[in-house]
Amino acid sequence: MNLDKCRSIVFALAMGGLFLAALFVLLGGASPVARADPGSLFISPTGSGTECSQANPCALQTALSLANDGDILYLAQGTYTGTGAAVITLTRSITLYGGWDGAPSGPVTRDPAAYPTVLDGERARRVVYISGDITPTLDGLIIARGNATGLTEGCPTSSGNPDGCGGGIFAYGAHPLIVNNIISDNVAALTTAGYPTGTTGYGGGLYLRDADRAVISGNVVISNVAGAADCGNGGGMFLFGAAEGARIEANRVLSNYATTTNMSCAWGGGISGGPGGALIRGNLVEGNWSNAMGTGYGAGLYQWYGAAHYVGNVVRGNRGRRAVYLGYSRSCFEGNWVVDNLTNEGLQLYNSIDGGPTLINNVIARSGGTTFAAYGHVAYPLTATLLHNTLVGSGSGYGVYVEDYVTLFLTNTIVAGHTWGITSTYPTSSTIFADHTLFWANAHDGLRGTNPIDGDPRFLNPAAGDYHLGPGSAALDAGVDAGVATDIDGDARPMGAGYDLGADEAEPSYRLYLPFIRSPIPEDL
């Protein structure tokens, strides 16, 4: 994917965001009062009857059966269970708000932290099922202990026989707004049989299929498992099929497993995506595992086909073979921090079709023996473009490792702290075009390309994961115009006499510096 296409995706998603922002304002306006609005239904774990008023709340299933498109359901504190395949089934565009204080009169007050509302699958069923061309909202709920074993509707079939998808939330062909929830302790599949004829679980916490315009924002997705006894794909969440305009933003995706076994058929401990063009922005993806032995693919992020846009995410402390894996991808990977992962490789690209990926303004650091790797195939040669990236090792391994059938363009790159800086193991079938690369503290720089620079980048505090450029950095004003107008923090390029190398454009001393973790991750998550 070229830079112009990356820009067009950002513009289209930004315009879609204006509509969604306006929608959130409408949904989050003044609180309705007791049953004066006929579209408000009130629910409690001990509710009864069909009045569903603030003074006389009803049961959850009663309210769901009475609700019409546009209605708002307020759920009081407590635990709600269900029967059958799911705790709740949504086929209308309604809103479910957790955290209602249960007051029988007066203004409706919500505080999900003070009045936790739990939808409990009891490890016996999926928690939430959403289907159809609808736009429901889930806000302020705890979605827990779901189990989708045997629920194979809408599951992929390419990685063994499916045996369950979406333990916490399953959405197929819908456009849900899933915001400010805790999605915890769910499993997509428990069955064991063995890959490739066996079973695969998809999306332990959340599964979206053909969910264009979906919004998944401000959630904590924690301790979910895709495949508890066999192959697994997407421990935290799995995105599949058409997802144009879908937005996965400002979530905390923590301590999820693609599979809890030692099997290598493990893809995407945190977030896994298939074909589609979702925006995945500003998420913290931390402490996830691809499998129990730390192998598998994409411990933090995994993409297989598609053209997603990953921007401003923090991927750290994940365990597996690669922290980020993009296969057959045309994605834009921009402004991300991939740091301190317990992996063999920080980021790997694998094959390409209909154009390749573009990486802009990323920091990939201390995430295994190889910081960046690229692999192609004679039938699917990989072409990739890297602009303004900072690649830092732990004193050993490879900075850039290229296998066969790869064409790689590197511009304004920092490569520091490796045994080998840039290397190609198959120079007869692969080509690396490196221009304006800063080399530092590598035992062997390897392929230096054109206009190489030697010198200390003077990162501000690399021991603490801060790879912003400090005073006297050899990267200052040493680059070339690569068509990149901002840096990893959104600051303008250039700020000095020329373009700085790597992901950061150093700010003038009079401007306030903020540590990197505060930029991509909202403080209110």
Role assignments for model-derived ranges:
Residues 124-131, 135, 450-505:
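C-terminal accessory segments
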Residues 515:
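Conserved functional hotspot residues at active sites or interaction interfaces
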